[in-house]
Amino acid sequence: MTIAKMIDHTALKPDTTKEQILTLTKEAREYGFASVCVNPTWVKLSAEQLAGAESVVCTVIGFPLGANTPEVKAFEVKDAIQNGAKEVDMVINIGALKDKDDELVERDIRAVVDAAKGKALVKVIIETCLLTDEEKVRACEIAVKAGTDFVKTSTGFSTGGATAEDIALMRKTVGPNIGVKASGGVRTKEDVEKMIEAGATRIGASAGVAIVSGEKPAKPDNY
């Protein structure tokens, strides 16, 4: 598998414009990225632009705080699928995890998994920068129990992004059959190679073109 096919080509800034989405989808077609990862408002346009392409549309759910109710997250998923999303990256209820309310964390993830079942792949963002190692392990275990397809490190909107150490811990926790996505601060081919070596099977990056072309990113982004 080429590096491009492991990358979710990402544009999640709040000031993202239509022109930027058109560029993103054009680049996805050109380079063969796994997906474009966009905010829900851009799902329909992205799906139209990628009709017939190998790249699919990924969107974010309960993003970036994870503090919506399970019911709201489930509605977001259904709306996104209706608009053409094939993958959804949800943020867990981080406060509930900190409170050791594992039942709520699981119910929250399961609401998204159930809403997406058979229609979209689910990635669960655990926001590693806010968690202890014990909490990272617990979050991954709950996500697997709830039926996720992937676990993912970060939103790119908090205090830190992906590290090889966290990827290795997540991979060890979920085993070989669940995907692990590194996201947040992955900007170069060298960064990607480190993450893959640690166990990542998907990369979230706004610098996708720079990564596959070997060029330096125009400016650093956290996601």
Curated annotation (Swiss-Prot):
Pathway: Carbohydrate degradation; 2-deoxy-D-ribose 1-phosphate degradation; D-glyceraldehyde 3-phosphate and acetaldehyde from 2-deoxy-alpha-D-ribose 1-phosphate: step 2/2. One of its GO terms (cellular component) is cytoplasm. It is found in: Cytoplasm. Keywords: Cytoplasm, Lyase, Schiff base. One of its GO terms (molecular function) is deoxyribose-phosphate aldolase activity. HAMAP family: DeoC_type1. The keyword Cytoplasm applies. The active site is at D89, K152, K181. Its main location: cytoplasm. It holds the Pfam family DeoC. Catalyzes a reversible aldol reaction between acetaldehyde and D-glyceraldehyde 3-phosphate to generate 2-deoxy-D-ribose 5-phosphate. Its EC number is 4.1.2.4. GO terms for biological process: 2-deoxyribose 1-phosphate catabolic process; carbohydrate catabolic process; deoxyribonucleotide catabolic process. It is an enzyme of class 4 (lyase). It catalyses: 2-deoxy-D-ribose 5-phosphate = D-glyceraldehyde 3-phosphate + acetaldehyde. It comes from the Bacteria. CDD domains: DeoC. The gene is deoC. The keyword Transport does not apply. Belongs to the DeoC/FbaB aldolase family. DeoC type 1 subfamily. This is Deoxyribose-phosphate aldolase.
